């Protein structure tokens, strides 16, 4: 955990000071922005870690080094919030942890709330990044592998938001317990902003027209 904590703190400082890098080294804006998003994705991936202390450290970095930073420009915070808000909200609810994690979550959300209030006070508009095209996979990638992740990434690069559903049980597969498989997928896609786990409380049978109709309406 100590090594992970140091690595996460380093990533947080890198994100805080990243705007100086773009001034010093001339490169296309797309390349610079992609690197920034990779750094943010690495921090978010730690929110899906199976170790609670790692998740707590990730929350601390997100709160203090990103949304609570006095160095990071408000427009950069807004850009990152727009991209990661949905993923962050999902990860906070997926791995709630114990009582101590509750205080970490509260502190992080407090930093985010202050950022939003301050940004809007001075005329900024905080939005979440959305896409019109949706791709849904009903248990196709179960068990989930790195090859499946690459397929999901390629689809989201085409402008889709990808949702992955985890089958409850299948007689045709020697599957691991449902929550274990869900955790594996969650850890694998935590750094992908437009790839999400489908909610567990909404079962979908693609052979059922009523389920397909409900899926389109969501």
In which residue ranges do the predicted regions lie?
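Polyanionic/metal-chelating signatures
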Residues: 5
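Nucleotidyltransferase catalytic core that binds NTPs
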Residues: 8, 12, 24-218
């Amino acid at each position: 955990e100590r090594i992970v904590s140091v690595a996460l703190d380093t990533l947080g400082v890198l994100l805080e000071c990243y705007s100086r890098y773009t001034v010093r080294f001339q490169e296309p804006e797309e390349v610079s922005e992609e690197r920034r998003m990779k750094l943010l994705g690495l921090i978010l991936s730690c929110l899906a870690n199976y170790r609670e202390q790692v998740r707590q450290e990730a929350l601390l970095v997100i709160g203090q080094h990103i949304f609570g930073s006095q160095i990071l420009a408000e427009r950069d915070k807004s850009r990152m919030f727009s991209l990661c808000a949905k993923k962050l909200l999902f990860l906070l609810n997926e791995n709630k942890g114990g009582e101590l994690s509750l205080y970490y979550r509260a502190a992080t959300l407090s930093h985010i709330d202050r950022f939003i209030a301050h940004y809007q006070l001075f005329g900024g508009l905080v939005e979440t990044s959305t896409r019109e095209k949706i791709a849904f996979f009903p248990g196709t990638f179960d068990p989930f592998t790195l090859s499946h992740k690459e397929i999901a990434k390629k689809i989201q690069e085409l402008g889709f938001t990808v949702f992955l559903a985890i089958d409850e049980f299948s007689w045709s597969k020697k599957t691991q317990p449902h929550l274990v498989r869900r955790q594996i997928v969650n850890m694998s896609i935590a750094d992908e902003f437009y790839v999400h786990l489908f909610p567990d409380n909404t079962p979908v049978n693609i052979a059922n027209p009523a389920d397909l109709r409900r899926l389109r309406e969501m």
